[in-house]
């Protein structure tokens, strides 16, 4: 049995789970999330706990078991607490600022890069070298953070670029001068 899939999920008091035909809907103080449900797994709700069980032991059922347990857990956490991803900008003259609902990035190119967050994602710049991506959908937060990081990935020689908080950039040594 899946180590992740067999663990029950604690349903927070402020979160509400609705299971309909092939669809999951989780609502809470921060918003509402929906997820289509495959027929290989079923979701059972008991008092304060939610369990995900698989129908049979096929390879696909085993794969979906752990996946849907984590998706449901992330949905419950998202509508109650929310998710935040922090990006750090390193480099001389590199900075970020909010211009209305657009994120304006100066990353050493001849032009500024403007990025509009999709619906359900909030962007903040507490200081010029930090970008906070927050919202209730963990997958969407990660996708938006990866998109912003892709504008100028950290390079290994000087470490300039946009990186996740806590990400370690393996540094390389430059070419050694010959005699």
Curated annotation (Swiss-Prot):
Pfam families: Ribosomal_L6
GO molecular function: rRNA binding; structural constituent of ribosome
Domain of life: Bacteria
InterPro entries cross-referenced by the UniProt entry: Ribosomal_uL6-like, Ribosomal_uL6-like_a/b-dom_sf, Ribosomal_uL6_a/b-dom, Ribosomal_uL6_bac-type
Biological process according to GO: cytoplasmic translation
Keywords on record: Ribonucleoprotein, Ribosomal protein, RNA-binding, rRNA-binding
One GO cellular component, as annotated: cytosolic large ribosomal subunit
Family, as annotated: Belongs to the universal ribosomal protein uL6 family.
Function as written in the Swiss-Prot or TrEMBL entry: This protein binds to the 23S rRNA, and is important in its secondary structure. It is located near the subunit interface in the base of the L7/L12 stalk, and near the tRNA binding site of the peptidyltransferase center.
Subunit structure of this chain's protein: Part of the 50S ribosomal subunit.
Name the record gives this protein: Large ribosomal subunit protein uL6
Taxonomic lineage from the root: Bacteria, Pseudomonadati, Chlorobiota, Chlorobiia, Chlorobiales
Gene for this chain: rplF
């Amino acid at each position: 049995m899946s180590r992740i899939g067999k663990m029950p999920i604690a349903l927070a008091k402020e979160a509400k789970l609705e299971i309909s035909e092939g669809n999951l809907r989780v609502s809470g103080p921060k918003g509402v999330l929906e997820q289509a449900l495959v027929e290989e797994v079923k979701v059972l709700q008991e008092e304060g706990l939610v369990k995900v069980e698989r129908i049979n032991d096929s390879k696909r059922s085993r794969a979906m078991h752990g996946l849907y347990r984590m998706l449901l857990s992330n949905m419950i956490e998202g509508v109650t607490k929310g998710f935040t991803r922090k990006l750090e900008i390193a480099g001389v003259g590199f900075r970020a600022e909010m211009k209305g609902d657009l994120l304006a990035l100066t990353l050493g190119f001849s032009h500024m890069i403007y990025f509009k967050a999709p619906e359900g994602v909030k962007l903040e710049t507490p200081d010029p070298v930090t970008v906070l991506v927050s919202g209730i959908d963990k997958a969407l937060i990660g996708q938006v953070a990866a998109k912003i990081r892709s504008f100028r990935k950290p390079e290994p020689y000087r470490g300039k670029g946009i990186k996740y908080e806590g990400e370690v950039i393996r540094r390389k040594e430059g070419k050694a001068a010959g005699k």
